[in-house]
C-alpha cells in the first residue's frame, strides 16, 4: 500500500509548493477505504484529502503516508489530529518530517492517542519525491534540475543558431511532462532573446500546470513585448536581475511580472544568491532549461542536483553550439560529477537521468 501512496505523491509534484507532495492510502482488512494526495497549492494535505473522500468509517484502519503527518496548526488543522479523530489504529510513515514545526511531533501525537506508528517503509523513494522540499529545509534553496536536449556529440544548435528539431516529438512531449512536475522553469536572457519562448506546459490536460517562469537577466532588459510578459497574468513570470531601469520595471510589473533584485558577480546575476531568494519564496523544484551560459553558471556554483539529457540521433560537429558554456576547469578533479540513475528510449531518442554524485 505504501507504493500506492508514493504514486499518489508523485502525481502532486510541481503543484504543492511550498508544501511537500504527500500521498495517503487508508486500508482495513485488505480493502482500500480512502486515497488522497496533497492538492494544488499545498492544501488540503494528503491525509486530510483521503479522510474527506472516505466512503465510510475509518475506525481500526491503517493509514500509509509518505511523510510524517503534521502536528501544528497552520491554515488547516493538524493531520495527526485528523487521523486520531478518524479512529485509525495504525499509521505507517515513509519518513519523519525534518521540518522544525513537525520533526517527530506528529508521530508523538499519534502514539499518545494509542495509535501504532511505524516509520521507514518506502523511505528511499519518499526521499527522492520530496528531495526539493528537503533541500529547501536543509539548505534554504530549491532543488535544481538541468534539462538538456542535445545531439550525440553534445550540441544544442548549429553555429547559426538552428535547433529545431534535435529531438523528436516524443522527447519534446516528455520534456513538457517534466515541466509539469516542477514548481518553476528557469532560463537566461539569451534564450529569451533568441527564441521568445512561452515556457508553458503544452500537453493536453496539463496546460493549467504550467510552472512559474523565471528569467535571469542581470540588466533587467526583458522586453514588455515578449511572449513571456504578455502572458504574465495567466502564468506567473519572475524576472531576477541585479539592476533595472525604473520605467521598464514599471511596465513589467503593470503587465503582471514580478521583479526580483539580487546581488551580481562579474556583471551577471549571482546564481547562489538567486537560489537562496527562490528558496525564500517557497520554491522547492526548479527546472533549468538554458541556455549554455546559465547551465555553466549553475554547474560552477555546484547547484545542479539532477540532470536529464535527451539525445537525438545526429552529429553536429565542433563548430556547433555546446549545451554547456565554459567551466574553466583546472583539471578533471574539478569537473561536476553525476551518477547515472536510468536510461530509457523516448520515441527515436534516448533520455539519460543523472543525480549529483555524493
Give the positions of each predicted feature.
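Enzymes that bind and transform nitrogen-containing heteroaromatic metabolites
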Residues: 1-19, 75, 143-145, 150-358
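N-terminal subdomain of lithium-sensitive/metallo-dependent phosphomonoesterases centered on the IMPase/IPPase/PAP
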Residues: 1-44
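Proteins enriched for Cys/Gly/acidic motifs involved in redox and nucleic-acid/cofactor modification
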Residues: 14-18, 43, 107, 121-149
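Zn2+-dependent cytidine deaminase-like catalytic core
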Residues: 26-125, 212, 238, 242-243, ...
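Active-site beta-strand termini and strand-to-loop segments that position acidic
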Residues: 28, 138-139, 355-357
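Short alpha-helix boundary/capping motifs
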Residues: 54, 111-112, 137-139, 306-307, ...
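Short capping loops/turns at secondary-structure boundaries
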Residues: 99, 103, 119-122, 137-141, ...
